Structure formats: structure tokens, C-alpha cells
Design a protein with these regions (language model features):
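N-terminal J-domain/J-like co-chaperone modules of DnaJ/Hsp40 proteins
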Residues: 1-43, 50-65
């Protein structure tokens, strides 16, 4: 997954990580995780896997110097 793909996924979920601090992004991720977690809604298993992959890519971009 590319960084652009990760941004696109979160934008579709109404989260705009490119305009957030890392702390704000983490809070937004946890809100999504509570909403789409497979234990809460089994039909969202694949979506949650994509959210987790996108989160990993975006967090790596926060760690890299610009």
C-alpha cells in the first residue's frame, strides 16, 4: 500500500491525515477502530485490515523527516 492509497482510504472514512498532527490522527484511528472492529461488526473484517495497513503506512510517513 502506498502513502497515497493510505490517505485515500482514510479520506473516504472522513479522516484527513495530511491535515492532522500525529496525536489527532491516532485519536481518529481509534474512533474508526471502535466503529469497524470485527468483534463489533463481523462484516467489516476486510475494511479493518485495510485501515490497519493504511495506519502503518501513514505512521511511517510521520516518522520520516520531510
Amino acid at each position: 500500500m502506498t502513502l497515497q492509497d493510505a490517505f485515500d482510504l482514510f479520506r473516504r472514512l472522513s479522516v484527513h491525515p495530511e491535515m492532522m498532527s500525529r496525536a489527532d490522527f491516532s485519536a481518529a484511528y481509534y474512533r474508526l477502530a471502535r466503529r469497524y472492529h470485527p468483534d463489533v461488526n463481523p462484516a467489516t473484517h476486510e475494511l479493518m485490515a485495510n485501515i490497519n495497513a493504511a495506519r502503518t503506512v501513514i505512521l511511517q510517513s510521520y516518522r520520516r523527516p520531510s
